[in-house]
Curated annotation (Swiss-Prot):
Active-site residues annotated for this sequence: K153 (proton acceptor)
Family: Belongs to the NmrA-type oxidoreductase family. Isoflavone reductase subfamily.
Assembly information from the UniProt record: Dimer.
Binding sites annotated in the UniProt record for NADP(+): G25, G26, T27, G28, Y29, L30, G31, R50, K59, R157
Residues binding substrate, per UniProt: H285
Gene: PLR1
Name the record gives this protein: Bifunctional pinoresinol-lariciresinol reductase
Impact upon substituting M143L: No effect on enantiospecificity
Source domain of life: Eukaryota
Length: 326
């Protein structure tokens, strides 16, 4: 197919609010939500796309829908450093949402090229790299092979900080779509009405965040001096729950108790080792959350927690989220 155009120079339909924002990875699972949140916030919003998209009609239609809502489409590529520099020169804030999930694609280190482009451009006031999960700085003892996710994110962090680029890191813990839909069971995204496997005793607390809320909080943070060069945590108090508590909410909705099987730590690890590499990476993350409680073994100050920083943002509770599956 032909190009969508290097830049849509038409005036966005929404009034500009604050910084000009470039979203990279804007057609992805979280990226499309970041674009929507940016537009909804009134930001002059730019969405980067590859010069040629082939015949990926869904991606093209999504990009065109962004354009119709007032976004600028910017043609650039990680294989063309000059195009990256030109793209970031258009904006004040860069938000990157390229995939770091191995079952999709793991592209975290591509951001090193983006860091170089931002450094060369010299105009970016805030960079939000692709993180949005567990804080990698707290995972230095993570298990193989899943630790590669955290290690690579730390490589990018060091490059950002060594380059002197202003940043905000967003730790949004567990995506609700992946965790709540399957009642915290790996490999499931719809809740059963009959049976659930509890990981260990099912009592380790996780933190479950609606992806739209992650996007909304991120867009609030980009112009906030309180979040400059800091990590913010999306840890809404009503969403800090154990697997048993999540299951209990679901049981209340469907009016019955699920049959429960306990999966011991040893059996989980044995099963994990039988999977392919990409699956093992994801299962390692489940292990740290559900067996070790890595999301609830530390306290977060109010000035670093998103729902405290922005109390006017209504976040979706676990109860509200699960209701859609009834």
């Amino acid at each position: 197919m032909g190009s969508l155009g290097k830049v849509n120079n038409e005036i966005p339909t929404k009034s500009s609010g604050g910084s000009k924002v470039l979203v990279i990875g804007g057609t992805g699972y979280l990226g499309k939500r970041l674009v929507k949140a940016s537009l909804d916030s009134g930001h002059d919003t730019y969405v980067m796309h590859r010069p040629e998209i082939g015949v990926d009609i869904e991606k093209v239609q999504l990009l065109l829908s962004f354009k119709m809502q007032g976004a600028h489409l910017v043609s650039a590529s990680f294989d063309d450093q000059r195009s990256l520099v030109d793209a970031v020169k258009l904006v004040d804030v860069v938000i990157c949402a390229i995939s770091g999930v191995h079952i999709r694609s793991h592209q975290i280190l591509l951001q090193l090229k983006l860091v170089e482009a931002i450094k060369e451009a010299g105009n970016v006031k805030r960079f939000v790299p692709s993180e949005f999960g567990t804080d990698p700085a707290r995972m230095e003892n993570a298990m193989e092979p899943g630790r590669i996710t955290f290690d690579d994110k730390m490589v990018v962090r060091r490059a950002i900080e060594e380059a002197g680029i202003p940043f905000t890191y967003v730790s949004a813990n567990c995506f609700a779509g992946y965790f709540l839909g399957g009642l915290c069971q790996p490999g499931y995204i719809l809740p059963s009405r009959d049976h659930v496997t509890l990981l260990g005793d099912g009592d380790k607390k996780g933190v479950y965040v609606d992806e739209d809320d992650t996007a909304a909080y991120t867009l609030r943070a980009i112009d906030d001096p309180r979040t400059l060069n800091k990590t913010i945590y999306v840890k809404p108090p009503k969403n800090v729950l154990s697997q048993r508590e999540v299951v209990g909410i679901w049981e209340k909705y469907i009016g019955k108790e699920l049959q429960k099987t306990i999966l011991s730590e040893q059996d989980f690890l044995a099963t994990m080792r039988e999977q392919n590499y990409a699956e093992q990476v994801g299962l390692t993350h489940y292990y740290h959350v559900c067996y070790e409680g890595c999301l609830s073994n530390f306290e977060v100050d109010d000035e670093q927690e998103a729902s405290k920083l922005y109390p006017d943002v209504h976040y979706t509770t676990v109860e509200e989220y699960l209701k859609r599956y009834v």
